[in-house]
Every structure is written in structure tokens, then in C-alpha cells.
């Protein structure tokens, strides 16, 4: 019901889960920001990972003249992420990101230009904007976005989570993954075909 109304449904199982959590998002258009803020407030993730294209409704590599609009979007998103109670925030840059603008607005986030391997608790995670960065040597958990050439799945015991398909929440102790569908209109906004006020 919430999904069809433009909100993201948070299950009782997720909300009642007492474990520390990792929130994984990717390719976020500005229309999603208010829902993202709501999710962060409700689930209080200890770790946030964004795998690139922070303002995905602005294809900066295609439309460089929209850099001011992009900059405003980055400012808004970073404010949401960094005002959370998360212990760590990790951001990999996407093909439509500007590293100087992202770094200008971040205070407590770690920004990676390419892929990185990070360890959170007893979980090793490889994070990148691109799924092809994982083909040769995947980690236990592999988080990415960009496109749907590789969907979220488990291959040979390795977990691959595509942040463009779903918002992913990993419970740290059990390693249980909660996948939340994006609201209707998210993909249209990513493609620049959808304009609404949320």
C-alpha cells in the first residue's frame, strides 16, 4: 500500500530488528530525498553506504550546465546523511558525480573515487558504482548501482546487492538483507522523465 502511494514500506520485522544496520542506496534522484530521510529516522542505521550518482535526475556528464542544480542536490543529500546518527558514511562516486562538489559538502563522510573494500563488524564489503568491479575478486558482500546488468543475488556464497533495484538494509549480526522497493516514479525521475513534488 505505501509503495503505490509513493512511500517506502518498512516492515514490522525490519523496524523491530534490534541489530546494528547498514543502509545501502544508489542512484538517488532528488524526489527520493524526503523518503530517504524518513527511512534513516525510522531505522537509525549505524552505517550508510551510497554507491554513486547522488543526484541521479541530473546527468551531469551529459548536461554540465546543470552543475548549480546538481550542487544544490548534493548539499541537500549530504545534509540528510550527515545529520543522521550513523557512525560511518561511505560514498563511492558515480559517472554523473563531480568529486570536487561532493568533497566540498562532506564533513564526516568517506568519499571514494573508485571501488573500495571496507570492513564493518565481521563483514567485508566491496563497494563501487559499477558491478564489473566485482567480477574478478568479489568480497563477502558486494554493493553497487549504475545499471541492472547484474541484479541482487547470491553467487557462490557471495552476496551482490544492486542499489538501483532496491534500497538494501543489512542486519550486521545475522547478515539478513532487507530489500525495500523504491517508490513509483523513482526510475522515471532517474531518467529525467518524471517531475512531481513529494
Predicted regions and their residues:
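Structural motif
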Residues: 14, 40, 81, 134-135
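N-terminal pre-catalytic segment of deacetylase/amide-hydrolase enzymes
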Residues: 1-16
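Active-site neighborhood of phospho(di)ester-bond hydrolases with catalytic His/Asp-centered motifs
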Residues: 24-27, 48-53, 90-95, 126-129, ...
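Conserved beta-sheet core of the metallophosphoesterase superfamily
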Residues: 116, 120-188, 194-195
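A short, charged/proline- and glycine-enriched loop
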Residues: 16-22
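Core catalytic region of metal-dependent phosphoesterases/phosphodiesterases
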Residues: 30-115
Amino acid at each position: 500500500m505505501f509503495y503505490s502511494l509513493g512511500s517506502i514500506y518498512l516492515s514490522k520485522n525490519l523496524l523491530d530488528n534490534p541489530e546494528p544496520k547498514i543502509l545501502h542506496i544508489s542512484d538517488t534522484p532528488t524526489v527520493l530525498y524526503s523518503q530517504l530521510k524518513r527511512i534513516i529516522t525510522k531505522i537509525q542505521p549505524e552505517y550508510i553506504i551510497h554507491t554513486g550518482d547522488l543526484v541521479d535526475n541530473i546527468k551531469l556528464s551529459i548536461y554540465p550546465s546543470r552543475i548549480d542544480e546538481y550542487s544544490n542536490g548534493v548539499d541537500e543529500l549530504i545534509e540528510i546523511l550527515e545529520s543522521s546518527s550513523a557512525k560511518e558514511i561511505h560514498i563511492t562516486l558515480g559517472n554523473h558525480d563531480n568529486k570536487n562538489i561532493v568533497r566540498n559538502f562532506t564533513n564526516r563522510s568517506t568519499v571514494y573515487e573508485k571501488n573500495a573494500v571496507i570492513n564493518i563488524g565481521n563483514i567485508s564489503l566491496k563497494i563501487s558504482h559499477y558491478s564489473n568491479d566485482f567480477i574478478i575478486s568479489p568480497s563477502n558482500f558486494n554493493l553497487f548501482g549504475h545499471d541492472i546488468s547484474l541484479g541482487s543475488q547470491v553467487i557462490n556464497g557471495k552476496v551482490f546487492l544492486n542499489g538501483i533495484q532496491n534500497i538494501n538494509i543489512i542486519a550486521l549480526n545475522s547478515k539478513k538483507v532487507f530489500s525495500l522497493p523504491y517508490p513509483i516514479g523513482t526510475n522515471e525521475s532517474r531518467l529525467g522523465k518524471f517531475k512531481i513534488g513529494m
